[in-house]
């Protein structure tokens, strides 16, 4: 099922789409317009400590953030951020540092901290030391509950960090329609990563809750 089929299945009037590049925006925009859906489009970016430091050691301090466009001008700003990450910060994949992001920031954007792969996760569950700098914006934070062993612990860490400072939103990542689709999804991910089902080496892929069915169960859609 396409993401818009899942939105129809859940009877929602808006869709929040987060992608790792801007290549899918135009198709997403046209599809949402055709279905009279409000589109909230976000670019998930890899944050590094220094955009000029392209070493193996620099990758240990990387984490993810999501930048959402509020409007048409925000879309143009997303293009600038993506271009900088692709051409100036590229090291195995697009990257950008907080200083560069700050220079490109505008009031047409919203910064979100994802639940998985964020600096909160990295600092508490890996050996990484990630130091974000939010002087130029007021980020929002996402939490999830997908029945993973660390979900509750990580949610508590997010609560500790955001206490009296930042808004927190409970979210649900959806990658497929039903729980029985999990194996097919995992197979697809393994093919993309050139791994096997016996040893997938994929973080946060030990749960079948990342689906529309689980969302429907939790929120009664």
How would you name each of these model-derived features?
Residues 1-221:
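Phosphodiester-processing cores and adjacent nucleic acid-binding clamps
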């Amino acid at each position: 099922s396409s993401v818009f089929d899942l939105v129809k299945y859940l009877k929602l009037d808006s869709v929040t789409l987060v992608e790792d590049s801007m290549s899918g925006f135009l198709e997403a925009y046209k599809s949402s317009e055709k279905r009279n859906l409000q589109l909230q489009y976000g670019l998930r970016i890899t944050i590094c400590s220094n955009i000029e430091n392209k070493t193996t050691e620099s990758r240990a301090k990387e984490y993810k953030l999501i930048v959402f466009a509020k409007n048409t001008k925000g879309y143009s700003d997303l293009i600038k951020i993506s271009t900088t990450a692709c051409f100036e910060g590229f090291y195995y994949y697009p990257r950008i540092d907080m200083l560069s992001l700050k220079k490109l920031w505008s009031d047409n954007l919203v910064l979100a901290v994802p639940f998985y792969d964020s600096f909160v996760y990295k600092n508490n569950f890996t050996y990484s030391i990630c130091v974000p700098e939010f002087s130029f914006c007021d980020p929002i934070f996402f939490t999830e509950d997908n029945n993973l062993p660390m979900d509750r612990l990580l949610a508590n860490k997010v609560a500790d960090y955001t206490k009296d400072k930042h808004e927190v939103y409970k979210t649900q990542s959806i990658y497929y329609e039903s729980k029985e689709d999990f194996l097919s999804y995992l197979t697809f991910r393994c093919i993309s990563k050139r791994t096997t089902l016996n040893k997938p080496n994929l973080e946060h892929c030990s749960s079948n809750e990342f689906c529309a069915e689980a969302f429907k169960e939790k929120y009664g859609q």
